[in-house]
Amino acid sequence: RRSSSAASDVYKRQSLDITDKNLVIRVDMNVPLKDSEVLDATRIKACLPSIEHALSNNARILLISHLGRPSEGNFEEKFSLQPVAEYISNLFNEKCELINSLESKDIFNGKFNVQLLENIRFFEGEKSNSAKLGKILASLGDIYVFDAFGTAHREQASTHSAIEQANI
């Protein structure tokens, strides 16, 4: 089943064949941290149904999220998603690899089923809804999935431009 929307076609999770596909999933894992520990995992746990559905279909996953409000284009350790990657690793009892670069040859290299892109707000063009960044994000996998309802109101590269430019 699919319905038409202004930006692109919208597919229901159960209707799309994701078997053995590379999925880029925009999630909302903007969680509170203290001393590199996740204080409240509610938003991470909200993403579990999509992650589990993908893994049960032998899909590989690259998660994209933001954390806090870093200066765009600059790495700030206090906004790193490393603690979130560690939390996900513990949840699934397998390593969730943190990816630091969009050019990384490690993306979907077959070594890890779940990967997490470093804080999307570290990348130039996220907040300005850069079409260039959106195109790069959309091209990283076979399917771009939006599962970040809490960020749906933001017109940013990972929540808007990537969706417009994704094939599926």
Language-model features, listed with the residues they occupy:
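Positively charged, low-complexity/disordered segments
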Residues: 1-9
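Active-site loop-to-helix "anion-binding N-cap" substructures in soluble metabolic enzymes
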Residues: 8-168
